[in-house]
Amino acid sequence: MYGNYPHFIKFPAGFGNSPVHASSTSVSPSSSLSVGSTVDGHHNYLEAPTNASRALPSPMNTIGSPVNALGSPYRVIASSIGSHPVALSSSAPGMNFVTHSPQPNVLNNVSSSEDIKPLPGLPGIGNMNYPSTSPGSLAKHICAICGDRSSGKHYGVYSCEGCKGFFKRTIRKDLIYTCRDNKDCLIDKRQRNRCQYCRYQKCLAMGMKREAVQEERQGSRERSENEAESTSGGSEDMPVERILEAELAVEPKTEAYSDVNTESSTNDPVTNICHAADKQLFTLVEWAKRIPHFSDLTLEDQVILLRAGWNELLIASFSHRSVSVQDGILLATGLHVHRSSAHSAGVGSIFDRVLTELVSKMKDMQMDKSELGCLRAIVLFNPDAKGLSSPSEVESLREKVYATLEAYTKQKYPEQPGRFAKLLLRLPALRSIGLKCLEHLFFFKLIGDTPIDTFLMEMLETPLQVT
């Protein structure tokens, strides 16, 4: 009955490897979309680039949402600074796109400046003229690496915060990159995340000094021995304040809660839950881009991480939102779904697990927003997601979140030495529940009895491949 549709679904780990036909509008592999910037807190809007071979034959052409960036048919995730759109296709393994992103490779060691040779196509390397260094003209400096606005002189070169952080992480972690093209990739403000190999070589070619990073690290280590622990806690590269800001920025304003039996909703709790999930997918990309260093990853890796963890990220959010309600969950739409309604709809088992293993535990320990944000960031930075070009970098970011969360709990709750461990124990339950919820969603989609909205449907139709 599904033979006329081109896409296949392969279930995530735990569901077997049998492909299941799914209904889907055929999408041209060459179609692409770009995500506009967020204005006044509203969601990003999509617009077709001029070089797209044809318009995407989908209602999403007229509906703006950053979620359309989540893979085929979600074409691109563009960072808030306007990263260049990347065309995706269904031919690449795991993530269904074709890219030229770098991957770590021991054959291309660029860990020392002696290995660097002049790159073709690097403009003005030998005759770069910097503006004056007076305080009044500092804002006029541009980044020598990508042309973005410079924040000052870093490691010997005027550069932006993005290139400064990229160079520092590369040196401190001794990262090794490769170029999938001819080692002459254009590095500018829009495409600086496309090739880490060429970006790093340009940093060195423009005069950034490895030893400056190493000296800075040694100096910070010595200072830390003489300074008291920061009141905010955690890593300076992963401040808990930024994680909290991300949570607060996307939290729906549910001032007036309503019941599932009101006229504004259907009587089917599954339909209400699916509608709420679809609505929250609008804000998921916006949230992720506010998490420190997520936008520094390649666009391909951003897509992979969001598609690998979207269900767990949404479940964690509505579970924490539900600690204030009795025997039910509170959806982003403001609807309160009762336990009895879930049982009558045939999803009582998984609903009870959400209440007992997540909502109840969060309520008992009074988990705050900062802790929730850290747990969600840990879920986001999943180094085991299939197809990542730089899993070691993702793992390093996850470890930074671990350190931030541990420092935060020690500083905020010194009388609870086991709080950090209790928080981490919610992650296996969240993972298990997330997989079971996916199983239910696939079932409801296939039997066709439950209306599933556009964006959630497309997320279900292009899951990660299991290898």
Curated annotation (Swiss-Prot):
InterPro entries: NHR-like_dom_sf, Nuc_recep-AF1, Nucl_hrmn_rcpt_lig-bd, Nuclear_hormone_rcpt_NR2, Nuclear_hrmn_rcpt, Retinoid-X_rcpt/HNF4, Znf_hrmn_rcpt, Znf_NHR/GATA
Primary residence: nucleus
GO cellular component, one term: RNA polymerase II transcription regulator complex
Keywords: DNA-binding, Metal-binding, Nucleus, Receptor, Transcription, Transcription regulation, Zinc, Zinc-finger
Segments of the chain annotated as binding DNA: 143-208
Pfam families, alphabetized: Hormone_recep, Nuc_recep-AF1, zf-C4
Disulfide bonds: none
Tissue: Isoform 1 is highly expressed inliver. Isoform 2 is abundantly expressed in eye and dorsal root ganglia.
Region of interest (Modulating), ranges: 1-142
NR LBD domain: residues covered: 235-463
Compositional bias (Basic and acidic residues): 214-226
Job of this protein: Receptor for retinoic acid. Retinoic acid receptors bind as heterodimers to their target response elements in response to their ligands, all-trans or 9-cis retinoic acid, and regulate gene expression in various biological processes. The RAR/RXR heterodimers bind to the retinoic acid response elements (RARE) composed of tandem 5'-AGGTCA-3' sites known as DR1-DR5. The high affinity ligand for RXRs is 9-cis retinoic acid.
Protein name from the UniProt record: Retinoic acid receptor RXR-gamma
